């Protein structure tokens, strides 16, 4: 089987997904013509030499595979999906908003098929008349593993990971946690929330604003992680993940990965979270309503992309979830580990290939 694969190879979420899909293509013996979006950089990942050589050969020989009859899988945003390498293009993408615009629907329909991560995103486009929309689900990154180390056994260690954004409720999560646990030495909150699209000065301003100009002895802001190994160590170090309180996700990889590593995640029962988070493997919080998605930076009102609302939650319901999660500290989330065994990238690739065939 031959496939053209157009995707970014970098340390961001799309790059992580791309590397995992490539690994499964390699295992299946698929002949791939790899067209990187942007400068390829796989230094964030521990890639075995044979697989690494295969990736490089797939880039070097991409024009040998290129043919109008070879299907192209493009892993990218709707914004920027209007060009194609071959006649049949299958866009693999993510969507966090709730009201597909005319332009987004036009671009989705332009593809042979548009594969949206998660049923929530797919339903938004199906209901808007995009009959070529198909859902798929991500898998658990096999490079993540349980280290078995003891990190801070004397403290209840909470963690939040993901770009600082309004739609992720980053500031609200931190402020809610501080209201309950701020300066209590029994508890620690570690935040890996650097947004690489902001300058260092902008990030400092966001953090200062979030903390209300106060100093807290039990909250840490960590630098942006450059490697998967650092992410793995972070997820192993925490007891309770709060990244799942995001109000709109294409999948929610940090909370999903933490869950699959046997940690306890407090998860908003909405959007793509509903595809993997259950009452058995997560501490679920029900939404209290919806609010506009617009932040004036990544989501701008009346723009051609990313319009609509995100889900919100009440502080009271999250306080209650914190307490439920505390009770589980020290116990392994066995159902979460089972989730990681069920959600594999082999299955993800099979779902994508099924859409092609």
Where are the predicted features?
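Acidic anion/phosphate-binding donor-loop and adjacent secondary structure
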Residues: 102-103, 139-156
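Donor nucleotide-sugar binding/catalytic pocket of nucleotide-sugar-dependent glycosyltransferases
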Residues: 112-126, 130-146
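Conserved donor-binding/catalytic core segment of Leloir-type glycosyltransferases
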Residues: 150-168, 174-177, 189-191
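Nucleotide-activated donor-binding/catalytic signature segment of Leloir-type glycosyltransferases, i.e.
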Residues: 200-229
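A charged, aromatic-enriched C-terminal amphipathic alpha-helix characteristic of glycosyltransferases
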Residues: 309-320, 326-356
């Amino acid at each position: 089987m031959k496939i053209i694969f157009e995707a970014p190879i970098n340390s961001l979420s799309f790059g992580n997904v791309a590397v995992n899909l490539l690994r499964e293509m390699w295992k299946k013996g698929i002949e791939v013509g790899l067209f990187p979006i942007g400068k390829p950089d796989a230094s964030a990942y521990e890639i075995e030499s044979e697989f690494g050589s295969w990736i490089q050969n797939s880039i070097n020989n991409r024009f040998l595979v290129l043919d109008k009859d070879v299907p192209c899988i493009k892993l990218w945003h709707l914004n920027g999906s209007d060009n194609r390498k071959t006649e049949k293009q299958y866009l693999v993408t993510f969507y966090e908003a709730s009201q597909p615009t005319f332009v987004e629907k036009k671009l989705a329909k332009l593809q042979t098929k548009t594969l949206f991560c998660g049923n929530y995103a797919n339903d938004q486009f199906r209901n808007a008349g995009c009959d070529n929309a198909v859902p798929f689900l991500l898998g658990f990154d096999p490079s993540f593993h349980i280290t078995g180390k003891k990190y801070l056994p004397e403290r209840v260690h909470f963690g939040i990971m993901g770009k600082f954004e309004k739609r992720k409720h980053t500031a609200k999560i931190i402020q809610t946690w501080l209201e309950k646990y701020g300066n209590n030495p029994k508890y620690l909150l570690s935040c890996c929330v650097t947004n690489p699209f902001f300058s260092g000065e902008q990030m400092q301003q966001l953090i200062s604003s979030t903390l209300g100009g106060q100093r807290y002895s039990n909250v840490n802001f960590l630098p942006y992680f450059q490697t998967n190994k650092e992410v793995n160590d972070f997820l192993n170090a925490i007891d309770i993940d709060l990244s799942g309180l995001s109000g709109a996700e294409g999948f929610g990889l940090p909370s999903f990965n933490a869950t699959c590593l046997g940690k306890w995640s407090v998860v908003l029962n909405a959007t793509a979270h509903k595809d993997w988070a259950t009452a058995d493997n997560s501490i679920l919080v029900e939404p209290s309503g919806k609010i506009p998605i617009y932040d004036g930076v990544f989501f701008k009102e009346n723009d051609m992309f990313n319009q609509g609302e995100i889900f919100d939650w009440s502080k009271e319901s999250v306080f209650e979830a914190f307490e439920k999660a505390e009770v589980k500290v020290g116990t392994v989330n066995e159902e979460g580990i089972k989730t990681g065994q069920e959600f594999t990238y082999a299955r993800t690739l099979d779902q994508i290939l099924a859409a092609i065939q």
